[in-house]
């Protein structure tokens, strides 16, 4: 319900042009300097991904990226690769930023503020380091003629907002929903209820049929089917056996167990989608929690979140946002070679996990 409600809120807010307007204003601020553009796109993508799903974020930012690259007459790949990394990094910071976190938060009863308190600091450090790394790696590509930069600096943003009342309405609802998430520990209102109230209010002013068509029902039913399969594994005792095996290998050491979960999650999530992986690991951690207690397991949840979300940066197929950017880029005449992305992705993931391990 949380995922469906947030998809509805984001779909309605997007129709107003709000996110494109924000992105364009930030880009005007850069005055067209390619390095500042990369920095701005990276930070904007990360912050937006903390509150919207990664796929929605990259879909919003890509048209702006291609427009800017065309105006500056430079290759858009440095921007696009940075946006992929930033979307996965930023999505790690909050409960609603990435589907694995929604799964973890629901299973472990972790609140929006729990994620914000525990993960935002390390995510911010990782983001700074990775954007600095991208600026260094692509330094030779990030050059543009002065007259090209002037075109971006004078970007007309006056017609980006297509529905001003809708922007105000959806913006207020989005802020109130996020505030509700933050105040969860005080109000004790479930995050899914808060999101559903916000989505229901916005639907009063829209045609529900049109909005519901924008919901990614394939993803929702994928989740439903996945949880049924995981429930079967749990009922047959398969999950309990996995939990006992991990504790036997680490001899019950919390630090060793945490490091195994962090690094294994990173590499596995780079090869397969992080959603089914997280859905499989979650009941296993709950089994460990039954044996070792909640205090022992709490750091393991954060390791699972960091590993699963950040591991998506390893390959071009590691996360749904990566695939969307890759396909769109190819359609626009700028394919992202698998091996080229892997070269940057492995480095990005290893640096991210090293920082997470510290």
Located regions from the model:
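Membrane-embedded alpha-helical segments and adjacent helix-loop junctions characteristic
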Residues: 1-74, 217-219, 224-292
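Re-entrant/interfacial helical elements at transmembrane boundaries that shape
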Residues: 23, 56-67, 80, 94-108, ...
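Transmembrane alpha-helix interface/packing and boundary motifs in multi-pass membrane proteins
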Residues: 44-53, 84-96, 180-186, 263-277, ...
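Membrane-interface helix termini and inter-helical loops of multi-pass transporters
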Residues: 21-22, 101-114, 183-189, 236-251
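Hydrophobic alpha-helical transmembrane segments
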Residues: 35-43, 57, 80-81, 116, ...
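C-terminal transmembrane helix pair
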Residues: 116-126, 256-358
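Membrane-core helix-loop-helix motifs of multi-pass transport proteins
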Residues: 68-147, 294-296, 324-355
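Hydrophobic transmembrane alpha-helices of multi-pass small-molecule transporters
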Residues: 1-15, 120-244, 336, 343-358
């Amino acid at each position: 319900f949380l995922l469906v409600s947030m998809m509805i809120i984001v779909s309605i807010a997007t129709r107003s042009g709000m996110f494109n307007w924000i992105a364009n204003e930030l880009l005007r601020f850069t005055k067209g300097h390619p390095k500042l553009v990369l920095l701005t796109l990276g930070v904007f993508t990360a912050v937006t991904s903390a509150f919207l799903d990664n796929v929605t974020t990259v879909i919003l930012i890509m048209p702006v990226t291609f427009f800017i690259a065309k105006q500056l007459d430079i290759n858009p790949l440095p921007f696009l690769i940075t946006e992929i990394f930033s979307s996965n990094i930023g999505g790690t910071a909050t409960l609603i930023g990435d589907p694995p976190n929604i799964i973890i938060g629901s299973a472990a009863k972790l609140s929006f503020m729990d994620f914000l308190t525990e993960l935002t600091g390390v995510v911010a450090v990782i983001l700074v380091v990775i954007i600095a790394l991208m600026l260094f790696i692509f330094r030779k590509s990030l050059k543009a003629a002065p007259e090209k930069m002037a075109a971006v600096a004078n970007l007309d943003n006056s017609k980006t907002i297509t529905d001003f009342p809708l922007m105000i309405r959806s913006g207020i609802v989005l802020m109130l929903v996020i505030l509700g998430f933050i105040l969860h520990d005080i109000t004790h209102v479930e995050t899914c209820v808060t999101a559903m109230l916000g989505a229901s209010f916005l639907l009063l002013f829209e045609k529900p049929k049109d909005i519901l068509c924008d919901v990614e029902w394939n993803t929702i039913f994928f989740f439903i089917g996945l949880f049924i399969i995981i429930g079967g594994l749990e009922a047959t005792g398969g999950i309990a056996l996995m939990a006992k095996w991990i504790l036997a290998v680490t001899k019950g050491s919390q630090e060793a167990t945490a490091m195994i979960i962090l690094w294994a999650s990173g590499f596995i999530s780079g090869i397969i989608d992080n959603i089914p992986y997280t859905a499989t690991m979650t009941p296993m951690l709950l089994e460990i929690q039954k044996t070792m207690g909640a205090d022992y397991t709490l750091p393991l949840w954060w390791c699972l979140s960091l590993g699963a979300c950040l591991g998506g940066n390893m390959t071009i197929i590691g996360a749904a946002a990566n695939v969307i950017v890759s396909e769109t880029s190819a359609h626009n005449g700028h394919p992202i070679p698998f091996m080229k992305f892997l070269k940057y992705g492995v480095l990005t993931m290893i640096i991210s996990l090293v920082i997470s391990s510290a």
